[in-house]
Amino acid sequence: LLQQLYANSFGQRPRASLLKALLIHTADDLGNPGPDYKFGWGLINLKAAADIVLAHKANPTAPRIIENAITSTLKTTTTTFTWDGVSPIRATLSWTDPAGAPQTAADSRTPNVVHDLDLKITGPDGATTYLPYVMPFVGTWSAAAMSASATTGKNRVDNTEQVYLSNPNRSGTYTATVSMEGPLTTNSQPY
């Protein structure tokens, strides 16, 4: 349904990474704040995702859905937005990563993302930086380890990242930055 709504609204099908980002971005959080090992990103809220698509259709210049790409000459993109300082800020980045090298080890802890894109939000002061959720390395799998909360930091292992500020406490202009370190294995990496 979401794919059809997007196609009807914009005349083309959304990329898989965009659908994934919309569903994660609008999911109702369950359990620990942010992603966790028990509930993932939460419960899909299709209406909230559809509302974003419709709001973007009504005002495509507002930064609700941003599709861009990292290239060999454009390794960083930025989007600025004005915020009220009261309501939460949530930014979600997702991309379809090229196939990595096959892994032979079961439950490998080695990052296997090919194009490691990074998301961060910089506050109005230009110095305060907010980083995405990262799942803690839990070592031995146990019930206690599986209930660990996500933290924030540089995410080196996932092709989806989310920055969430529950109470920004500061109104003004924020900047969302998507960047990539390392070489591209393709001409571009859309997100």
Please state what every model-predicted region is.
Residues 35, 118-191:
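Noncatalytic accessory or regulatory domains flanking protease catalytic cores in secreted, cell-surface
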Residues 27-31, 96-98, 125-127, 182-183:
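Acidic glycine-/aspartate-rich tracts in secreted/extracellular proteins
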Residues 38-115, 123, 186-191:
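Secreted peptidase-domain scaffold signal
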Residues 1-33:
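Hydrolase catalytic cores
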Residues 9-13, 36-39, 109, 153:
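Hydrophobic alpha-helical scaffolding
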Residues 14-22, 41-44, 112-114, 158:
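Generic recognition of stable, solvent-exposed alpha-helical segments in well-folded globular domains
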